[in-house]
């Protein structure tokens, strides 16, 4: 019954859509009901009615199965038989077309010179009496289940360990399987003698005066501010190029001599050699040439041509070479070829 009513509703809806609408292009005035009367605003679009069966799939308004009839065939509807456009050609073959087809087979039959694997005839004396393809009988095999002799060595859980050595000392932590017997709360006896490290005070006054700040227990006794006791000069103290100055005795008396010449004056000492950066180099060849390039690996080749020592030599592209022509020869009476003049 429900299907019949649904069909009747569809027929009524189609009939209403096919009828021409009255007062569709006019604006109605006054009170109008919302349903089932038409809207007062004219419109040209056709109302699409979606059946209730299409609204069940996640609020989708699109039809699940699109059934639109048109003249275009769908995929798989073609029945095309591909035939060659050439029917009466001498070069037509199953493998394609070519200019001069060959009727011979491309690869001939391969005939092996050796016999096949099943073509051998084995002599009866070499053939085995036992067919190894069949399973072996149980008579020539060891029994699968047999009693194994018990070993005299006890199993890991068959020992009777002494309870006294494995007794738990306290209940603070769990007892391990291989527990150490060394007690964790070992306190050395006072009869052992010396104090423990860090429990005694070293008298530093016997070695050197103890400073006022804190020091470590095992302090190094090496002095940090020792003065050198060596008499020899240290590194950088002497000049190897310096000559030893020998005091010369003056042969002139201190008193004034009665002569007309003065005392000879000693030569002035040599000035010290200049160090790096103290030279003042003077360029007497003129101002330096400033190169255009300023790269890190600048070329050392000069950009200005230098005058050659032989000015009479021709430069490049000054030669005019001439291509030599063909030279004719004459055969003389002495059977020799002589160039013609």
From Swiss-Prot:
UniProt keyword list: Apoptosis, Cytoplasm, Nucleus, Phosphoprotein, Repeat
Superkingdom of origin: Eukaryota
Mutant phenotype after disruption: After exposure to alkylating agent, significantly suppresses the depolarization of the mitochondrial membrane and the activation of BAK and caspase-3, all of which are hallmarks for the induction of apoptosis.
GO cellular component, one term: nucleus
Positions carrying Phosphotyrosine: 78
Localization in the cell: Cytoplasm; Nucleus
Any single biological process term in GO: positive regulation of apoptotic process
Placement of STPGR repeats on the sequence: 73-81, 115-123, 154-160, 194-223, 232-255, 273-284, 313-323
Stated role: May positively contribute to the induction of apoptosis triggered by O(6)-methylguanine.
Family stated for the protein in its record: Belongs to the STPG1 family.
Protein name as it appears in the record: O(6)-methylguanine-induced apoptosis 2
Name of the gene encoding the protein in the UniProt record: Stpg1
